[in-house]
Amino acid sequence: MKLVAPFETSMDRSEIRRIILVEANVDGVIGWGECVAGESPFYSPEYTDTAWLVLRNFLWPLVKGQQFKAASDVWALLAQVRGHNMAKAALEAAVWDAEAKQKDMSLAKLIGGTREEIACGVSIGIKPSLDELVAAVKEELAAGYQRIKIKIKPGSDLEPVRRLRQEFPRIKLMVDANSAYTLEDWPLLKQLEGFYLMMIEQPLGWDDLYSHIELQKKLDTPICLDECIHTEEQARAAVELGACKIINIKLGRIGGYTVARRIHDLCQDHGVPVWCGGMLESGIGRAHNIALSTLPNFTLPGDVTATKRYWAEDIISPEVTVSPQGTIRVPVGPGIGLKPRLDLIEKFTVRKEHLV
């Protein structure tokens, strides 16, 4: 699927997304999941081609022919495979969607969600010029988004933030480095504190918890961890050792709803707010993100946005829209509450495999 506009981070630039969809038949009821792995292993060791192989060769054989009392039982089987959380999450999410449909209830309600609408922020990629960045922020604020996140990297950090604060002194603003810095860069990151940021997301190495602990000691601005958190155990270490004050929970990165709910509860018990990050999902993945964001400790605006921000044509109906107040209504229909557009899925499909 082709994005409406290219999206650039400190790691790479995306223009087209190859998306793996999982369609699971659970006792005659169809559930849908989406694998959020990217084209290349820059955000995560996983990427599209490896996820396909792991789903087909390892995860499917583990669940084939098994009887489950609930979707939450699937994780114990999938956990036998080390890593590959994005592939696991796609399969597990499809089973959760099917269970909610079997019970004729929304997925949000099934997982314990409490919200009828969720607060929305927006993530803006690195732009060629500051004027283009300002124009993009103006457009998103006019659309109603409650929080602005911009991507930063060395050489594109202080000046973009300074310019935005001059133009928009009162907006909720945060930055995301996607691991672009090292602990030696702490004086530069300290300078960002003068711009009253909500948080600095994943400033240091994707597997470097220790340096984040040391950095958070030096900063008053909260650190939010993303790439560092793949398991409940890593989340516990980050929270209890002081590596962060906020955690971004992504279904794909941590392996699905079962682990997401555990991390959510852990953070809630420790007074650590969470929010839902985005991975350039299609409407199916976005619907799952909406459901996840209804859990009570998702108290900060997430990266769940309107369909039209990324896709001229999406594969669900109705498309997701954002209110002028910067919120999305939670679907109340069974399962994810949005219907896959089978005609468009067929149109965009380049590879299909039927596993029985």
Where are the regions that the model predicts?
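Structured beta-strand/loop patches that form or line metal/cofactor-binding pockets in enzymes
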Residues: M1-Y43, R309-E313
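Conserved, mostly hydrophobic/aromatic
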Residues: V22, G28, L59, L91, ...
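Metal-dependent enolase-superfamily TIM-barrel catalytic cores that perform enediolate-based chemistry
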Residues: K109-L219
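C-terminal extensions of enzymes
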Residues: R309, I315-V356
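Metal- or metallocofactor-binding catalytic centers and their adjacent structured scaffolds
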Residues: N25, I30-Q102
